Regions:
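Terminal, low-structured helical/coil segments at or just beyond the last alpha-helical repeat
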Residues: 168-214
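Alpha-helical segment of the N-proximal tetratricopeptide repeat
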Residues: 33-59
């Protein structure tokens, strides 16, 4: 499942949120216009209009103590808009709290957090987020996370773990062949696997695998 599609998982809860006022732990006696602003932000988020949603969420975040779910929404918006540092700023603190949500909703936040750290080349921070996502996502969503984990370990020159994750990613891609450009991805993974095997074989060439993670 593509990241954009994955991010919509768990948003069925918004239907009930749209009819509610700002939660008690956000504020008391909220003015009506801010309730409307929250409703609009949620509607934009649900419609994948992340830029518009983020503008409204930021304004609310400046004025109220938003709950953990809304902060996670802000983090997801930032991730979708390539604002990776800000995404981590919002998502990192709420990760311990997302375990109370439905598994697939958790996977949305873990993936957005992991990808944000990955894009910032913070591979050690990305690894546990990808691993937690693997525990709660559907099987047909695991390939991308396994693929990224392969690169996380490769960049750390942990060839054995990189090899294991690349091989697992290839198996999942082959089984759930849904991804656009799958043939090119599989060819790349094959090259990465061969490169990692050369690194783990003392009798083989010292050539390193390519570090292109697209």
């Amino acid at each position: 499942m593509k990241p954009k599609r994955c991010l919509m998982i768990g948003l069925a809860t918004l239907a009930s949120l749209l009819g509610q006022s700002i939660p008690a732990n956000a504020t008391l006696n909220s003015p009506v216009n801010d309730k409307d602003r929250l409703s609009m932000a949620l509607e934009y988020f649900q419609s994948e209009k992340y830029r518009e949603a983020l503008l409204l969420f930021r304004k609310l975040d400046q004025e109220y103590l938003l709950n953990q779910r809304y902060k996670a929404y802000i983090g997801v918006c930032c991730y979708r808009l390539w604002k990776y540092e800000e995404a981590c700023m919002y998502l990192d603190p709420v990760m311990p709290s997302v375990t109370v949500y439905a598994p697939h909703e958790q996977s949305v936040y873990y993936y957005a957090n992991a990808e944000s750290h990955f894009q910032l080349k913070q591979y050690q921070a990305a690894i546990p987020c990808y691993e937690k996502m693997l525990n709660v996502c559907h099987d047909n969503e695991k390939a991308d996370a396994l693929y990224r984990l392969g690169f996380c370990y490769l960049f750390r020159k942990d060839w054995e773990n990189a090899l294991e994750y690349f091989e697992s990613a290839r198996a999942y891609y082959q089984h759930y062949g849904y991804k656009a450009g799958l043939r090119q991805r599989l060819e790349q993974i094959g090259n990465m696997i061969n490169g990692c095997k050369r690194q783990t074989d003392p009798t083989a060439s010292a050539a390193s695998p390519s570090d292109s993670a697209k």
